[in-house]
Amino acid sequence: MGESERSEAFGIPRDSPLSSGDAAELEQLRREAAVLREQLENAVGSHAPTRSARDIHQLEARIDSLAARNSKLMETLKEARQQLLALREEVDRLGQPPSGYGVLLATHDDDTVDVFTSGRKMRLTCSPNIDAASLKKGQTVRLNEALTVVEAGTFEAVGEISTLREILADGHRALVVGHADEERVVWLADPLIAEDLPDGLPEALNDDTRPRKLRPGDSLLVDTKAGYAFERIPKAEVEDLVLEEVPDVSYADIGGLSRQIEQIRDAVELPFLHKELYREYSLRPPKGVLLYGPPGCGKTLIAKAVANSLAKKMAEVRGDDAHEAKSYFLNIKGPELLNKFVGETERHIRLIFQRAREKASEGTPVIVFFDEMDSIFRTRGTGVSSDVETTVVPQLLSEIDGVEGLENVIVIGASNREDMIDPAILRPGRLDVKIKIERPDAEAAQDIYSKYLTEFLPVHADDLAEFDGDRSACIKAMIEKVVDRMYAEIDDNRFLEVTYANGDKEVMYFKDFNSGAMIQNVVDRAKKNAIKSVLETGQPGLRIQHLLDSIVDEFAENEDLPNTTNPDDWARISGKKGERIVYIRTLVTGKSSSASRAIDTESNLGQYL
């Protein structure tokens, strides 16, 4: 057996590295083992020397121990080598020069790119690992010490906010207005170009999934040094106040206000639909309409119906499809327009009218509707805790009849305290037309009930049987009975006894405080009672008794409404004008068993918050 074979027989790897001391000792052991093996081979019979066999086992054990030590040493050396490599990589990384960043301006066919970096426009090469064709304009790129593009980043997410004035003809540039009304032309980054390409350009034809187009007045994130706009920033404070839509409300949905509807159609629709006739007669269309009257009588509903009707009529004049009629109804939530910071309310008003002019420039009618107009345009000088109206009112006046003017824009205001609105707003030439939306009388109430009680409603079999199954006659009788009950001057319908400043007294009935909203509430309450009746008895259908019970419940709930510190203010809000009221006594005798209550007011109370 050779030396290498004997080494492998003892479990020592042929190529295992050993220290000098271990190698010498191992070589001595090998020689001793060779001598002992020769002695064993020369021995004859069964009396082989046991000492030699024992020595061999000891030598083998020692060889195994040395092999284990050698294996452990190899693992230690391997770990040390890996740590050295990691440290070398860290040293190399820390020793690298800093990288720069820039904004990509353009790409070229020879794999070079134009980059704006460190205030300079430079043409640079791309690393072989970068596909220059995949880079997008306006994208952030990383540069090494040799000014080579080595990595593509995202689009810039911080910068200045500028307002879009207009998109230039090529669709890739825009005119924006920055701080201090400074105008500049900037490039549009690729995400904005996808939104904003004009429909006539070839790049826009196949883009069916692009977001909505940019429009003048949008806020853009701009890098003024690189000359790029990256993103459209929503204007939350204005978007929350402005609702752009064509309301799905028509004049047919409004009951009991035919005279007022005719007035507002004459004021709004005629100037838009017959501009030539107005020019021929040198007649100036009204700039605004004021709808005033008690709460719940349909002021907001009429304003929505005006926008809907005007859009359809304009579509007919242009020969467009009525289903694709387009108009804009900017619904301004009056109290939310107020802002505690100086100048913010005025700025919001400017933005609203700027948006209206932008829409109207397309030739589309725009209605700016101010609900609760008295809350933001109070008479100047009447403020107690603030004087915001001294600047807000002039801002509205300048927008209505300023130098720029309003073309295709009409302002509609709604209020139940028209006496609190500044007189300068109500003068002719501003809100020219003033339409009072009165409380419904018995005839108007029948019209309103007919909008809610239709022949499609399920009617109880017993009520139908009284009219030989004629559903139309049954519904008509229901409406007549419920209107008679609501407008009857009986003791159960007495509501208030008011005392005027001159000592006169007057008994007022619930019919004096009816409104379209109350009628809708009565019908809804009756329908709910009909549903409960189905669940309890299993007999479906609406009954006249459900409506009569609902009237009693509705009147009883209104018992606490006049409980106010100042009866005269409450009466004005409710639509009661004339002599000042100093004393109110409730006369409700419905389901409530409590005694009637009186509300008095003292004179010279002064102003209160």
Curated annotation (Swiss-Prot):
Region feature (Disordered): 1-24
Pathway: Protein degradation; proteasomal Pup-dependent pathway
GO molecular function, one term: ATP hydrolysis activity
Result for mutant: K225A: Does not dramatically affect proteasome substrate degradation
Signal peptide feature range: none
Cross-link named Isoglutamyl lysine isopeptide (Lys-Gln) (interchain with Q-Cter in protein Pup), sites: K591
Impact when changing V342A: Abolishes proteasome substrate degradation
Activity across pH: Optimum pH is 7.4-7.5.
Binding, ATP: G296, C297, G298, K299, T300, L301
Regulation of its activity: ATPase activity is inhibited by EDTA, N-ethylmaleimide (NEM) and sodium azide.
Pfam families per UniProt: AAA (PF00004), Prot_ATP_ID_OB_C (PF16450), Prot_ATP_ID_OB_N (PF17758)
SUPFAM superfamilies: P-loop containing nucleoside triphosphate hydrolases (SSF52540)
Keywords: ATP-binding, Chaperone, Coiled coil, Isopeptide bond, Nucleotide-binding, Proteasome, S-nitrosylation, Ubl conjugation, Virulence
InterPro entries reported in the protein's UniProt record: AAA+_ATPase, AAA_ATPase_domain, ATPase_AAA_core, ATPase_AAA_CS, NA-bd_OB-fold, P-loop_NTPase, Prot_ATP_ID_OB_2nd, Prot_ATP_ID_OB_N
Oligomeric form and interacting partners: Homohexamer. Assembles into a hexameric ring structure that caps the 20S proteasome core. Strongly interacts with the prokaryotic ubiquitin-like protein Pup through a hydrophobic interface; the interacting region of Mpa lies in its N-terminal coiled-coil domain. There is one Pup binding site per Mpa hexamer ring; the K(D) measured is about 3.8 uM. Upon ATP-binding, the C-terminus of Mpa interacts with the alpha-rings of the proteasome core, possibly by binding to the intersubunit pockets.
Protein name stated in the entry: Proteasome-associated ATPase
